[in-house]
Amino acid sequence: MQGCVVRILPQATIGDGFVLVLIDESGDPGFKLTSGSTPYFVMAMVIFRDYRQAELASQAIQEARTALRVTSEFKFNKCCDVVRDGFFEAVQPFKFGVRAIIVDKSSIYSHNLRTEPERFYSFFLRLLMDHDGGALVNARIKIDGSGDRQFKRELTSYLRRQLGPGKMDNLRFVDSHKDALIQLADMVAGAIGRSCNTDRKNHARWRKQLAPKIENVWPFR
């Protein structure tokens, strides 16, 4: 199948301390809350502590893509309810953890965070990774590859500086279209984000499906 690769990391990089983390967000960093910006911003990380589980989950997502007739990639906000149900059912057997931060933008008063989207993104990514419950130990981090090249360099330097040694082995920005596990992070962030919108039908449905995987969701206020 084209579009998603199964190989997660070169075999030579795999050891007993394997930690793979996939990060994506739901919502936007904008503050035009009365004219289109989302009221909540959610950032989630999916944590695999076993290489084989990561490979099997990736394969299952690819197979679900065929079974559910998804022609491009899994994106929570572009999927119908049937596809969302099928996706979360497909990944349920595999061992991974979920940690997330939910930002209620109405509680953010910092001028810098409200007016500089890249600073907003970097700040909450750092908070998510810093409050990791001990999950990040020499972790291989993959982030959905949005942003320009300079921002990616600056973000990588910022995280290494702020987090200190030991948490992050390497950080890569990847194309979600080519990485099934980044699509998993998108679907997870989307499910948690949807649960915040209590006026929406089935707002908590997919977060409930994820409940056995969730290690922590931090409501930042």
What are these regions (language model features)?
Residues 1-221:
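Phosphate-ester processing/binding pockets and catalytic centers
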